[in-house]
Curated annotation (Swiss-Prot):
One of its GO terms (molecular function) is phosphatidylinositol-3-phosphate binding. The gene is ravZ. It is an enzyme of class 3 (hydrolase). Keywords: Host cytoplasmic vesicle, Host membrane, Hydrolase, Membrane, Protease, Secreted, Thiol protease, Virulence. One of its GO terms (cellular component) is membrane. This is Cysteine protease RavZ. It comes from Legionella pneumophila subsp. pneumophila (strain Philadelphia 1 / ATCC 33152 / DSM 7513). It catalyses: [protein]-C-terminal L-amino acid-glycyl-phosphatidylethanolamide + H2O = a 1,2-diacyl-sn-glycero-3-phosphoethanolamine-N-glycine + [protein]-C-terminal <stereo>L-</stereo>amino acid; [protein]-C-terminal L-amino acid-glycyl-phosphatidylserine + H2O = 1,2-diacyl-sn-glycero-3-phospho-L-serine-N-glycine + [protein]-C-terminal <stereo>L-</stereo>amino acid.
Amino acid sequence: MKGKLTGKDKLIVDEFEELGEQESDIDEFDLLEGDEKLPGDSELDKTTSIYPPETSWEVNKGMNSSRLHKLYSLFFDKSSAFYLGDDVSVLEDKPLTGAYGFQSKKNDQQIFLFRPDSDYVAGYHVDAKSDAGWVNDKLDRRLSEISEFCSKATQPATFILPFVEMPTDITKGVQHQVLLTISYDPKSKQLTPTVYDSIGRDTYSESLSSYFKGKYRTTCDEILTQSIEKAIKSTDFTLGKFTRAAYNHQNRLTEGNCGSYTFRTIKEVISSSAQGTEVKIPGSGYITSNSYLTSQHVQDIESCIKYRNLGVVDIESALTEGKTLPVQLSEFIVALEDYGKLRSQQSEKSMLNFIGYSKTAKLTAVELLIGILNDIKGKNEISESQYDKLVKEVDCLMDSSLGKLVQFHLKNLGAESLQKLVLPCVKFDDTIDDFVTIEKDELFDVPDITGEELASKKGIEQGALDKEALLKQKQIKTDLLDLREEDKTGLKKPLHGGIKVK
């Protein structure tokens, strides 16, 4: 999708053009869908706002404020690499609008994490002749509220606020997700701002690119400093040095994962503040994709965005009560529905059918599983025939990206397989309806059995044949012949084991 980017667009692409890249390349980045209004906005209805599964999303496809807020649910998930429960507890009161409050378990540090908001935007002018830029009214208001809170605070505090910075002339760059933190020391009455940025600054490539493109500014540091100074103007606070802690990640022009790096850094800042240690992030200029945002981090992020169906009210309870949000069966159903909807819109890739399953096969299997899960959710019994059909579709359901979706939910629902998830709800038939029909002539066609034949079959000598056993065999034949005679009168007797005689 091509179009002009504005401060209201929700795209968070994480790169300024490298040396040699043309400004028009910005159009290659797709705009993401608009955000829902988040808590703290009067328009929000917490009871109905939902962040649904996005089963086709990947970590490099970009972040928006809705996705970032959804990821906050991982902070008190004990199975997540982003778990904060060992470092902080939640504050019962909510002294700051739009922020979650935490108390360090190891010192008196208080930490306030603001919810992501699409209106937290700052713009910078790239040329030296213009003023520094602008800060969105809502972001400016949050800075004033932080200043007001600190005027009454007696404990050290750290404020964490994700925001988007962008050039006022969008042809000179792109929107970029960064993280603003402000540390407050009540003894010295000093506020110290820091911006964490996933684009390496002060590198040779960055400086050379800015020089040739005539960029006097490439960040919002100057306008943010001015805004913070304005917020504390009527106080006796001092402002510490504004610092931008920048680090690199790989393939910045093609990876839209600055939002994922921001989320990773939120966790790092909270844990470090709670422990009273320095925030440890990679240095500027280093390629750090796999060492900082590890494969486990990426998996947790993608699984949350792709497979979970979470409401704003759920995330609020997790962050205000410090509890894990268990995966529900209903989330499994919604994720499958999203997968089915997207898969039905895709064209058939026949070249892959030799090694995988066709589009039709996947959709059929998904529809079957959705129906079964809905029955389980409604506490209805699953028929034996439904179960048999599911067993036949298991391999298809566990294939490729669909298999990852299914495996995620099975693991979180505590089931080793689809069969074990469904089996407790299956009602098996108590009676056998399908009889085996045998012709009566075949039933009574009993060959003569001689001692010699039995002996030869057994591989024993004729003299060792048990005469009593031979007599029993003959008696059986006699009894069967008697039954045959009775049948001539028209009497038909069913035999044991569900076998009946014609």
